[in-house]
Design a protein with these regions (language model features):
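Short helices/loops that flank or line small-molecule/ion binding pockets
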Residues: 92-106, 174-175, 194-199, 266-280, ...
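Conserved N-terminal structural module of periplasmic/extracytoplasmic solute-binding proteins
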Residues: 8, 12-119, 137-139, 182, ...
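C-terminal lobe and pocket-closing loops
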Residues: 119-121, 286-297, 309-412
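Extracytoplasmic/periplasmic solute-binding protein
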Residues: 153-161, 166, 176, 191-236, ...
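Glycine-centered hinge/linker elements that transmit conformational signals in sensory
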Residues: 195-199, 234-262, 305
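Ligand-binding clamshell of periplasmic/extracellular solute-binding protein-like
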Residues: 54-65, 83-147, 160-170, 184-194, ...
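Conserved C-terminal helix/tail region of periplasmic/extracytoplasmic solute-binding proteins
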Residues: 176, 182, 255, 364, ...
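Hinge/lid segment of periplasmic solute-binding proteins
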Residues: 37-43, 112-167, 192-196, 202, ...
Length: 444
């Protein structure tokens, strides 16, 4: 359900181009920063060490902020957070309302933003952000692919939080029934995976991989190849060779019964829990859904995803989903906000050690993988130290540019792959249609 909520929020939060309003927005950045400096000085004089935060999910994001507050209070006993729960759609609405009205006084000091919403909001509403590039946070300690989501023109606007690294979770018992091992599926190409998967399908009578339909898996495959649908701010669909290979592979695997598509999310999850599939490729957050089937403990394993054959720079790594912390232009004490974020989510292994077992939050902070907590074996995954492996995967994810048009790209590619899979439509023709659709939507 977390994943479903994420997808709905992302699609609701991304939208069309609003360049006409950017000039006023840039003016608002300057004015807002001037106001922030004066308010910050007043706040420091009064000795107030309270920051307001907007985020959602009491057991995940809010819990994380509460633990970060406790850690920071060890050296700053007067520090407090005023954490205000808002679902993401409401946060996005409030941010856009503030930006369009030019009144930023309603914004909190810190807010959580879905990663795929950053580029759109930075482009259309830059006045809501305080830039973090010179905040003192060491961004080199976070994965390149994750950072790209909240970075624009070389400037940082978000501090990465949870990890959406792509995994391939497979049923080890079904793999063994085919005379194979889990290790056989590590570091494969898609052609190698295809041959292995055929054996698993034949031995167990179920598809190798469940897909939630649409273009989610396509986007992960494309990113793993180091390719993007946007290049230098322009749509790059029609002549995108990596995307064409991705669609060809996906279509072939569906036709061969290796991938089974589910358009209903509950049925998609049930396919894993009920033994109707031998695996799944998705962001690592899918693990919580897999683990709902307690009777399958010890029967699952995690490996990296296959990579595209014949593509220079192709990898076995991608990312799907996640969120990052941002500081608003209305922050009343930017120095305090910067130091709090730097000292907690930006550097505290202690914090991430708490969040993993108690909230299920896997870090995007690379050094967290070296801690004892991340090295602990998981009984559910047959004794594998899955969290260490996942953070390692995240460190190898290529950067991926969807610009400000993520939802438009998802929609266009979903239409394209649906026509290819269900109607045997020509791939080149569908890519051209997607290109034209995106260019029209962006220009209008």
């Amino acid at each position: 359900m977390l994943a479903a909520t994420m997808i709905v929020s992302v699609l609701a939060g991304c939208g069309g181009n609003q360049n006409e309003g950017n000039t006023n927005e840039k003016e608002n950045v300057t004015n807002s920063n001037e106001d922030t400096q004066s308010v910050s000085a007043e706040t420091n004089e009064n000795g107030d060490e309270t920051l307001t935060v907007w985020c959602w999910d009491p057991t995940f994001n809010i819990y994380a902020m509460e633990q970060a507050e406790k850690i920071y209070q060890k050296d700053h006993p007067d520090f407090k957070l005023d954490i205000q729960e808002n679902i993401y759609n409401d946060i996005e609405t409030k941010l856009i309302t503030a930006a369009t009205s030019g009144d930023y006084s309603t914004l909190p000091d810190i807010f959580l933003m879905q990663d795929y919403s950053f580029h759109k909001n930075i482009a259309n509403f830059p006045g809501i952000f305080t830039e973090l590039t010179d905040s003192g946070i060491d961004f080199s300690q976070f994965t390149e692919g994750k950072l790209a989501d909240s970075t624009a023109e070389g400037k940082n606007y978000g501090l990465p939080f949870d990890n959406g690294a792509t995994i391939m979770a497979i049923r080890s018992d079904m793999v063994e029934a085919a005379g194979l091992t889990v290790d056989d599926f590590k570091d494969t190409t898609w052609s190698q995976f295809e041959e292995l998967a055929k054996k698993v399908v034949e031995a167990n009578g179920v598809p190798m991989i469940a897909s939630s339909g649409g273009s989610e898996l396509l986007m992960e495959m494309l990113q793993s190849a180091g390719a993007s649908p946007i290049v230098d701010g322009k749509v790059h669909i029609a002549d995108n060779e990596a995307l064409k290979k991705t669609m060809e592979v996906y279509k072939k695997l569906v036709d061969e019964g290796i991938i089974a598509e589910y358009t209903d999310w509950d049925q998609y999850i049930a396919s894993m829990n009920d033994g109707k599939t031998a695996g799944v490729i998705n962001g690592c957050w899918i693990m919580s859904s897999i683990q709902a089937a307690e009777d399958q403990s010890g029967k699952w394993a995690i490996v990296n995803m296959p990579k595209l054959d014949g593509v220079d720079g192709a990898t076995n790594y991608a990312n799907c989903g996640g969120a990052s912390w941002a500081v608003s232009s209305n922050c009343k004490n930017t120095e305090l906000a910067f130091d709090f974020l730097k000292s907690t989510f930006g550097s505290s292994v202690e914090l991430y050690d708490d969040l993993l077992p108690n909230a299920g939050a896997i870090a995007s902070y690379i050094p967290a993988a070296q801690s004892d907590v991340y090295n602990q074996a998981s009984d559910f995954y047959g004794g594998q130290a899955v969290y260490k492996d996942i953070v390692g995967y995240a460190g190898s994810v290529p950067a991926f540019d969807c610009g400000a048009y993520y939802s438009d790209i998802i929609s266009a590619l979903t239409d394209a792959i649906t026509n290819v899979v269900q109607n045997n439509a020509d791939i080149d023709g569908e890519m051209n249609n997607a290109q034209e659709t995106l260019e029209f939507n962006i220009e209008n």
